[in-house]
């Protein structure tokens, strides 16, 4: 074994690239690099010979493509190596995909490799990238302005669908590979396109690499060390960025939202790494769409004093900042649709967002207009009412203020995102007086109920269905879905140890504890029985009433049993205190309490849980079983509800 082979073996061991039970698919083009790699693996005894197979994709781009294919076939036939070949017209495929030749070739290659790996149950794809490729890649990315994570260059291994791609030749040079191929008399083809100065990589190879090697013969080892050190740094930073995104990211159908209130206070390097990670997620790990300029544009949006801004990113990705939220969504920009409706008495209109507006004569039983209604004195306005978009110069006469105020300033005060303002209905009377912008502001024409006057009432009904409006009611994600499941696994292990062999009666407190109980008991690995109680002191409010009611009692007897009570949250503690005392009174052998959330600031009785998932601040939290007026239980995370939602 010569020095070159020793360094490859050492590199494989250092990065744990190949294990004895791996099955290898070697990508072989017919050139010296990949044939040398195949020869090395075939003679290395790293894996049994029957664990090695070959894949070759004929791109049909060059005259000698058929010769290269024949070289691969001949080598494999002589050695008895299984090989898989596919021929693809890359030019035609590029036209149909509307992508460049190089990008299309890469996509098709990896699709082919992954297909073979899946069909043949192969877990490692072996590629022949070497030290020259590494230097070229790092320099190209630096000059092109790639995001900083690209500076680390080609990695020894990366995840693929159903396996890994590995690169054991990264520590050795092109010259060493040629020497190896000639030493072992390998017949290979030379890709004539590698000498063409039309390609960027070839210009770096021909003009920069010779200069660098002349300046410092140790340039290869220096770039190898640079790649490994920067990779380690980026991996550490990426772990922090991943945690940051888990706490501040909401995925809602086609839209992904980054919550900015705490995110923008993080250190700039962490923000940049988190944005890069987010873009990789959005672009499905295709880094070709991401440059450092895109990341800096987004960071500028986040740190700007302008609360409403928008930028277009590659592949029709749009980033919209709306005050403390940054929304990402693929698609075309929608031109604001203009609308204009006339509203006569007893008419009802429906807007594009499925909200509806209705005008009626005030009933004698109507005592209040509420937040979603407005009372008007008939003598002060002229019918029909007009429902339209805003227009430049709109002004509203304000209650308790002299003069009028620009609608634009009212929107800014209310923190209405710029891209949403043209969608809001502006209600005027027939003479043009602005009466109301539903959900934003009422004018000075808003009146109290009067039995003596003829009055109209406008009713605005929002479309509150659908997942989007539910997520938009959340001020901040407090505990992410991943954090919940990690804590539940931890609690499950503790409860398994506690109750092994005791067959406890597990009591779920309806309704809020149901999701928590369902996930938790999957993690408790011992026999148990389940029952439920529905005990409440809240109703549809946000503060405990102090009165505890049993809505559903247990079916099973607790006498002589070990009882574990599962609750979603301990707030005032009044409900749980009553329940625990009741179970003890019924002669349970033991009573223990596990709660997902504990809110000590709300406590007004003495009670402590035996097992606690998370301690939460004195905020109104919803999600994962917790509700407000029976809403939000199906959120997959724990979030803080916006105050305006429960104060309406």
UniProtKB/Swiss-Prot annotation:
Q: Please state what the protein is called.
A: Bifunctional protein TilS/HprT
Purpose: Ligates lysine onto the cytidine present at position 34 of the AUA codon-specific tRNA(Ile) that contains the anticodon CAU, in an ATP-dependent manner. Cytidine is converted to lysidine, thus changing the amino acid specificity of the tRNA from methionine to isoleucine.
What is the reaction catalyzed?
Answer: IMP + diphosphate = hypoxanthine + 5-phospho-alpha-D-ribose 1-diphosphate; GMP + diphosphate = guanine + 5-phospho-alpha-D-ribose 1-diphosphate; cytidine(34) in tRNA(Ile2) + L-lysine + ATP = lysidine(34) in tRNA(Ile2) + AMP + diphosphate + H(+)
Using the UniProt record, give the first listed, main subcellular location: cytoplasm
Give the UniProt family note.
In the N-terminal section; belongs to the tRNA(Ile)-lysidine synthase family. In the C-terminal section; belongs to the purine/pyrimidine phosphoribosyltransferase family.
Q: Where, subcellularly, is it found?
A: Cytoplasm
Q: Which domain of life is it from?
A: Bacteria
The free-text domain remark for this protein reads: The N-terminal region contains the highly conserved SGGXDS motif, predicted to be a P-loop motif involved in ATP binding.
**The protein's required cofactors:** Mg(2+)
One Gene Ontology term of the biological-process aspect is: purine ribonucleoside salvage
One example of the protein's molecular function in GO is: tRNA(Ile)-lysidine synthase activity
The record's section on HAMAP family has: tRNA_Ile_lys_synt
Q: What is its EC number?
A: 6.3.4.19, 2.4.2.8
């Amino acid at each position: 074994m010569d020095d070159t082979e020793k360094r490859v073996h050492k590199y494989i061991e250092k990065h744990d690239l190949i294990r004895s039970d791996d099955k290898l698919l070697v990508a072989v083009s017919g050139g010296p690099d990949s044939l040398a790699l195949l020869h090395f693996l075939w003679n290395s005894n790293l894996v049994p010979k029957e664990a090695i197979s070959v894949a070759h994709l004929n791109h049909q781009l060059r005259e000698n493509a058929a010769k290269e294919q024949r070289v691969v076939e001949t080598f494999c036939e002589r050695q008895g190596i299984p090989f898989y070949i596919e021929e693809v017209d890359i030019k035609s495929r590029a036209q149909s995909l509307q992508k460049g030749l190089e990008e299309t070739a890469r996509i098709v290659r990896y699709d082919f490799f992954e297909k073979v790996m899946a069909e043949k149950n192969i877990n490692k794809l072996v590629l022949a990238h070497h030290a020259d490729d590494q230097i070229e890649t790092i320099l190209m990315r630096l000059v092109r302005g790639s995001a900083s994570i690209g500076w680390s260059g080609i990695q020894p291994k990366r995840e693929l669908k159903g396996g890994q791609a590995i690169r054991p030749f990264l520590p050795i040079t092109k010259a060493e590979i040629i020497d190896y191929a000639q030493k072992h008399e390998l017949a290979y083809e030379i890709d004539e396109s590698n000498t063409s100065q039309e390609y960027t990589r070839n210009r770096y190879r021909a003009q920069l690499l010779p200069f660098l090697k002349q300046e410092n013969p140790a340039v290869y080892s220096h770039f190898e060390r640079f790649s490994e050190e920067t990779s380690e740094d980026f991996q550490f930073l990426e772990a922090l960025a991943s945690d940051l995104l888990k706490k501040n990211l909401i995925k809602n159908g086609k839209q992904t939202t980054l919550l900015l209130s705490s995110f923008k206070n993080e250190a700039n390097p962490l923000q940049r790494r988190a944005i890069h990670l987010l873009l990789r997620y959005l672009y499905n790990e295709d880094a070709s769409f991401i440059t450092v300029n895109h990341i800096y544009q987004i960071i500028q949006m986040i740190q700007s004093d302008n609360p409403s801004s928008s930028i277009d990113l590659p592949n029709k990705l749009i980033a919209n900042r709306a005050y403390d939220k940054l929304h990402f969504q693929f698609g075309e920009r929608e031109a604001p649709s203009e609308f204009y409706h006339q509203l006569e008495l007893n008419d009802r209109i429906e807007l594009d967002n499925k909200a509806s507006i209705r005008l009626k004569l005030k009933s004698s039983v109507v005592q209040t207009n509420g937040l979603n209604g407005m009372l008007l004195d008939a003598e002060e306005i002229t019918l029909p009412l007009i429902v339209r978009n805003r227009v430049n110069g709109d002004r509203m006469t304000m209650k308790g203020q002299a003069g009028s105020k620009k609608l634009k300033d009212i929107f800014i005060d209310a923190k209405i995102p710029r891209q949403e303002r043209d969608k809001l209905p502006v209600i005027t009377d027939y003479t043009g007086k602005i009466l109301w912008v539903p959900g934003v502001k009422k004018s000075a024409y808003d009146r109290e109920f009067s039995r003596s006057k003829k009055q109209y009432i406008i009713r605005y009904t929002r479309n509150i269905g659908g997942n989007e409006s539910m997520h938009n009611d959340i001020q901040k994600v407090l505990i992410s879905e991943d954090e919940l499941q990690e804590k539940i696994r931890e609690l499950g292990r503790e409860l398994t140890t506690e109750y092994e062999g005791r067959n406890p009666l597990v009591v779920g407190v309806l309704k809020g504890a149901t999701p928590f109980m369902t996930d938790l008991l999957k993690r408790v690995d011992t026999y148990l029985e389940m029952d439920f109680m529905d005990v409440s002191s809240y109703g549809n409010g946000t503060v405990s009433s102090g009165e505890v009611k049993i809505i559903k009692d247990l079916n099973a007897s607790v006498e002589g049993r070990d009882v574990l009570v599962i609750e979603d949250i301990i707030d005032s503690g009044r409900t749980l205190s009553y329940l625990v005392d009741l179970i003890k009174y019924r002669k349970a052998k033991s009573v223990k309490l596990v709660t997902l959330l504990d809110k000590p600031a709300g406590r007004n009785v003495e009670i402590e849980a035996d097992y606690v998932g998370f301690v939460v601040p004195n905020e109104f939290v919803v999600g994962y079983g917790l509700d407000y007026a029976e809403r939000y239980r199906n959120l997959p995370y724990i979030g803080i509800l916006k105050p305006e939602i429960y104060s309406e």
